[in-house]
């Protein structure tokens, strides 16, 4: 087979996926190394723009942990994580919103626009997109009893109004969403970006939810597991084989598929064009989470 024929075959491999996902919505959580390394930033932006021009509707929800950590450190503020959630006081909340909505969001918008897309940056506070309430984390104490931990100004989404996203999509724009929301009382709350992505995927009845990470996917005993069912995940969390920042990722995937999102994926954002590999190739990449 000559080189040109090989290229054509690679393009044709994508055909059934293009037919399947044409006009559909895919929510992508963008974070980790893919937001730091220049090559990965460029390849991610290219993936998003290409998907839009192919007739697929990508919605990007982003994190920004490294940028937040850097500014918190320079301001001599303390930071703590519990099961992947940042404990957030008022000073930290100011930093979080400034970095996520004021800086990182606009950087992503600029990058995607540079690649030929029409991105629009917003946060969960804009257009009443996401309403949240304070999140009290339930954990098991040493005596086996359940207890709740106050994480400060950390929220959990109670409702999502997708109208602003749907309006942007109809006009050909790509929504880029910062994970900051507001309570009914007007209090600004920090939302875990994975959790925000899952809630938005549910509200949009997305076909796919994709979370970019700095691991090959879900690792159990150091080995990549390419397919997991709900019952497996609960067991792995209980035994500690899934822990730390991976817990909110798998929990948001489970919530999404429970609410009608067809497929949820945790993939390696360190691989250039990982989003296209997952959506448009037979092999895919990372871990698939499904019902069962």
Curated annotation (Swiss-Prot):
**Pfam families, sorted:** AA_kinase
Q: Name the keywords, alphabetized.
A: Amino-acid biosynthesis, Arginine biosynthesis, ATP-binding, Cytoplasm, Kinase, Nucleotide-binding, Transferase
Q: Which InterPro entries match?
A: AceGlu_kinase-like_sf (IPR036393), AcgluKinase_fam (IPR004662), ArgB (IPR037528), Asp/Glu/Uridylate_kinase (IPR001048), NAGK-C (IPR041727)
Q: Which domain of life does this protein belong to?
A: Bacteria
Pathway terms, separated by semicolons:
Amino-acid biosynthesis; L-arginine biosynthesis; N(2)-acetyl-L-ornithine from L-glutamate: step 2/4
Which residues, if any, are the signal sequence?
none
Looking at the keywords, is Kinase present?
yes
Q: Does the keyword Transcription regulation apply?
A: no
- Tell me the disulfide pairings in this chain: none
Return the protein name: Acetylglutamate kinase
Q: Report the source organism.
A: Leptospira biflexa serovar Patoc (strain Patoc 1 / Ames)
Name of the encoding gene: argB
């Amino acid at each position: 087979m000559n080189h040109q024929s090989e290229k054509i075959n690679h393009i044709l491999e994508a055909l059934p996926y293009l037919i399947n996902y044409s006009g559909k919505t895919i929510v992508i959580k963008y974070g980790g190394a893919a937001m730091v390394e220049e090559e990965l930033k460029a390849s991610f932006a290219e993936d998003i723009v290409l998907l839009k021009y192919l007739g697929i509707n990508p919605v990007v929800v982003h994190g920004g942990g490294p940028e937040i950590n850097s500014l918190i450190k320079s301001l001599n503020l303390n930071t703590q994580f519990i099961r992947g959630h940042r404990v957030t006081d008022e000073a930290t909340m100011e930093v979080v919103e400034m970095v996520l909505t004021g800086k990182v969001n606009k950087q992503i918008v600029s990058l995607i626009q540079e690649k030929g897309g029409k991105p629009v940056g917003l946060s969960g506070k804009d257009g009443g997109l996401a309403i949240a309430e304070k999140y009290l984390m339930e954990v098991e104490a040493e005596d086996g009893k359940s207890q709740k931990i106050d994480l400060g100004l950390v929220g959990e989404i109670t409702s999502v109004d997708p109208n602003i996203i749907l309006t942007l999509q109809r006009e050909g724009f790509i929504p880029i969403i910062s994970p900051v929301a507001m309570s009914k009382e007007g209090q600004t709350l920090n939302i875990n970006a994975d959790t925000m992505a899952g809630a938005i995927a549910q509200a949009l009845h997305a076909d796919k939810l994709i979370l970019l990470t700095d691991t090959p996917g879900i690792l159990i005993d150091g080995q990549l597991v390419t397919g997991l069912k709900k019952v497996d995940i609960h067991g792995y969390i209980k035994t500690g084989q899934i822990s730390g920042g991976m817990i909110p990722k798998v929990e948001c995937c489970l919530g999404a598929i429970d609410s009608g999102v067809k497929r949820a994926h945790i993939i390696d954002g360190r691989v250039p064009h990982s989003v296209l590999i997952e959506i448009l190739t037979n092999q895919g990449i990372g871990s698939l989470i499904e019902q069962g």
